[in-house]
Structures are given as structure tokens and as C-alpha cells.
Amino acid sequence: SYLVKGDDGTLGIVGDAFSEIAKMSGIRITEVNLPRKRLRKMMAKGKLDAIFSAIEWEDDVSRYVWTNGIILVSDNIVMRADSNLRVRQTADLKGKSIVVRADYKYPSLDPLITNGEVTSHKANKFENLLRMVERKHVDLGIIDQNVAKWIIRKEGLKFSAPLRFVSPGFDEVQYRVILLSKKWLPQVDAFNEALAKLKHSERWQEILNQYR
């Protein structure tokens, strides 16, 4: 099976969990990293068996089958620690400039961006997003804080001013494996059973600790 693996912490957790379950089940998989535009083209051509995603982010999910959620993710507001802005929820973003990831969906923010109530800039990489916040190119950034902290640790990033994340996050979704053909439906129950066993094992905590 071919399945897309990204380079951020959240996808790393999902990818490692999937690989672990595949080993337990004797399934061979090939994981590939793809830019989002190329990913969509390969999906349309039927060249992928599965992707890591959230069903809330995919169009016409009735065409697919999917596993139980592997990990819960959300968007957090990030700002410089010395910022005087008081922002606790998405409504507080009106009139602000923010940076988001290119090609990502933000259900709570997209209407504000479309209406011009929020000025948005797009970053192609998580590090670029964090740097734009650090350098005051924008007021705020939007990123899952667990992913951000993993990127900072993995890349050894240093900032001229500390960054602060606002909790709780918003637009919570479950990352899962989305199978792009219904031929996989018979395997989903077995996958979910193996996933439940993994989450009750020491190995699951080891996977999480690698990224947090």
C-alpha cells in the first residue's frame, strides 16, 4: 500500500502508529512525502491507497473509508511572549494580521479571512510561519502547538524573543488514516482493533515521547 507521510510532528505520530500496526498485521507499506498539490494529483489518478488526514478536511468523504482517530490535533494561536495582544479565541483575531500554512484548511478562520476581517499571509513551512511571528511580520500565527514544539526541538530553532501559545486550541479534529478505496473496508475493523491495543501499550507512549 502507498500512503503519504508528512514531515511534521503530528503526521510523524500517525505514520509511526500506522507502521507499527502494519508490522503487527504483516502488511507491507511504502510511505512517501509529497507536496499537497502533487498529493491531490496522485489521489485523482488513483496512485495512492491512503493518506493521513482528517475527514473534516477532505471533500466528498463518502467515497472513502477511514480508521478511528489516531491522535487529536487542534490549531493554536502563537505570538511573541512580549506581545500585549489579548487573544483567547478566533473572534479576537478580527483586525489582526496572521500567518497560516499554505493549502491548509481553517474552518473557524476561513470566513473571517474571506470577509477581510483578518489579514492572512501564507507560509510554506512551519519554521517560516514561526519566524514571521518572531520578526513581527504579522501579529499572530496559527499552528498546532505540539507540532510547533517538535519542529523547534528537531531543528534546534532559536528565537530572538520567546514565543507563547494560547490554549486551549480550536478546530479540534482527529488525524486518522483515510483509505481512498472502499475495497479496504474489510480491513478497517482489524486496524481499529490493533490501534486500540497499541494505545494501551508502552510502545504508544514511546511513539508520543519521540515528538513531544
Predicted segment positions?
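Extracytoplasmic small-molecule ligand-binding "clamshell" domains
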Residues: 1-62, 122
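Short coil/turn segments
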Residues: 7-11, 55-57, 81-84, 96-106, ...
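Extended ligand-binding regions for polar small-molecule ligands
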Residues: 12-24, 84, 91-96, 103, ...
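Ligand-binding cleft/hinge of the Venus flytrap
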Residues: 16-27, 68-69, 90-94, 102-125, ...
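Hydrophobic residues within well-ordered alpha-helices
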Residues: 21, 43-44, 77, 93, ...
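A ligand-binding cleft/hinge motif common to bilobed small-molecule-binding domains
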Residues: 41, 53-63, 139-171
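Hydrophobic/proline-rich hinge and linker segments of small-molecule sensing/allosteric domains
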Residues: 67-88, 102, 179-181
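Periplasmic-binding protein-like
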Residues: 72-76, 157-192
